[in-house]
């Protein structure tokens, strides 16, 4: 067992420390979502559509990221009443977003019985210097990252699940691809280093040494790593799975499309059968119009992924 609350998720051995044991439980809960699709929903009807399509969880929101981009202003935690309404409509786990650093929003979400909390850069950050201490909560947190250093810093704070940041609400998968390639590329580089070089690498990426060492041993992140931010089609979802992700978040891509129920089912099938081009071709047919995407080369587009490190 590594020190500083590090849990060898994919290894064996008894866990005796209470705090570490609690974290291990949260990591285990996050692993239960592995291989699945998590969909953004704004009402009970959409939540039921997502569940019927085979989603492993839903993210309860007042506005999907595409609407947050279009409408601007300050994006905050959703109304707890809406979240409870969505939670009562489905049997699958329900997630909700809290602003970065806003531990009181997280306390409220925990109090209403939410299953997972996403400390999300999609919402307007409440603290530009500190993230939530996620070890203070009983329920699992998911956090975004652009690279291995960010991922391991969030895990050190208590995140039980990592996702790419991508660029939510754009329907453009390029940043999600960039982020997952960065994380996996750094892990491959890490595995080629000798033990002495690992210290310098940990310092270089500003991550705790014990987590860096554990990642080298595992050959992967010590928690599940999902794709998020710009996934809009079954092909996008399968691409992220083939690149090495453990599952996929789909935000605006489903309910901003021409046939949400059909597209939701297709994306779930694409994640399940991501290595079978014949099934991918079949589920990609006749889905209706995809959401209108945003060109990220436009300098006017706000980069949510840059809101925290």
From Swiss-Prot:
Annotated D-ribose 5-phosphate binding sites: 40, 169, 230, 251-252
Keywords: Lyase, Pyridoxal phosphate, Schiff base
GO biological process assignments: amino acid metabolic process; pyridoxal phosphate biosynthetic process; pyridoxine biosynthetic process
Pathway: Cofactor biosynthesis; pyridoxal 5'-phosphate biosynthesis
Active-site residue numbers: 97 (schiff-base intermediate with d-ribose 5-phosphate)
Pfam families, per database record: SOR_SNZ (PF01680)
Signal sequence bounds: none
Matching SUPFAM superfamilies: Ribulose-phoshate binding barrel
Catalysed reactions listed for this entry: aldehydo-D-ribose 5-phosphate + D-glyceraldehyde 3-phosphate + L-glutamine = pyridoxal 5'-phosphate + L-glutamate + phosphate + 3 H2O + H(+)
Superkingdom field: Eukaryota
UniProt binding sites for D-glyceraldehyde 3-phosphate: 181
EC number from the UniProt entry: 4.3.3.6
Record carries keyword Isomerase: no
Molecular functions per Gene Ontology: pyridoxal 5'-phosphate synthase (glutamine hydrolysing) activity
Keyword flag Lyase: yes
InterPro entries per record: Aldolase_TIM (IPR013785), PdxS/SNZ (IPR001852), PdxS/SNZ_N (IPR033755), RibuloseP-bd_barrel (IPR011060)
Similarity section: Belongs to the PdxS/SNZ family.
Function summary: Catalyzes the formation of pyridoxal 5'-phosphate from ribose 5-phosphate (RBP), glyceraldehyde 3-phosphate (G3P) and ammonia. The ammonia is provided by PDX2. Can also use ribulose 5-phosphate and dihydroxyacetone phosphate as substrates, resulting from enzyme-catalyzed isomerization of RBP and G3P, respectively. Also plays an indirect role in resistance to singlet oxygen-generating photosensitizers.
HAMAP family hit by this protein: PdxS
Protein name: Probable pyridoxal 5'-phosphate synthase subunit PDX1
Name of the gene this protein is made from: PDX1
């Amino acid at each position: 067992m590594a020190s500083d609350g590090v849990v060898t998720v994919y290894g064996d051995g008894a866990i005796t420390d209470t705090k570490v044991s609690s974290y291990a439980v949260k990591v285990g809960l996050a692993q239960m979502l592995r291989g699945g699709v998590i969909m953004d929903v704004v009402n009970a009807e959409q939540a039921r559509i997502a569940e019927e399509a085979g989603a492993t969880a839903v993210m309860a929101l007042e506005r999907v990221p595409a609407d947050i981009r279009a409408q601007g202003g300050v994006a905050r935690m959703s109304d707890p009443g809406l979240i409870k309404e969505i939670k009562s409509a489905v049997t699958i786990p329900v997630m909700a977003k809290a602003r970065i650093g806003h531990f009181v929003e997280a306390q409220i979400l925990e109090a209403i019985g939410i299953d997972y909390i996403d400390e999300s850069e999609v919402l307007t950050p409440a603290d530009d210097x500190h993230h939530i201490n996620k070890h203070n909560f009983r329920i699992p947190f998911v956090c975004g990252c652009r690279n291995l250093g960010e991922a391991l810093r969030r895990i050190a704070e208590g995140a039980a699940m990592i996702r790419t940041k991508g660029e939510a609400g754009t329907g453009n998968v390029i940043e999600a691809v960039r982020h997952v390639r960065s994380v996996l590329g750094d892990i491959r580089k890490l595995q080629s280093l000798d033990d002495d070089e690992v210290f310098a690498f940990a310092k270089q990426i500003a991550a705790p040494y014990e987590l860096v060492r554990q990642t080298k041993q595992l050959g992967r992140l010590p928690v599940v790593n999902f794709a998020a931010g710009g996934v809009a089609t079954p092909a996008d979802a399968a691409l992220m799975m083939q690149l090495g992700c453990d599952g996929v978040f789909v935000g605006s891509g489903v309910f901003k499309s021409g046939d949400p129920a059909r597209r939701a089912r297709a994306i779930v099938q694409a994640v399940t059968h991501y290595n079978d081009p014949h099934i991918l071709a079949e589920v990609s047919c006749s889905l209706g119009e995809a959401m209108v995407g945003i060109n990220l080369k436009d300098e006017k587009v706000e980069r949510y992924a840059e809101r925290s490190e």
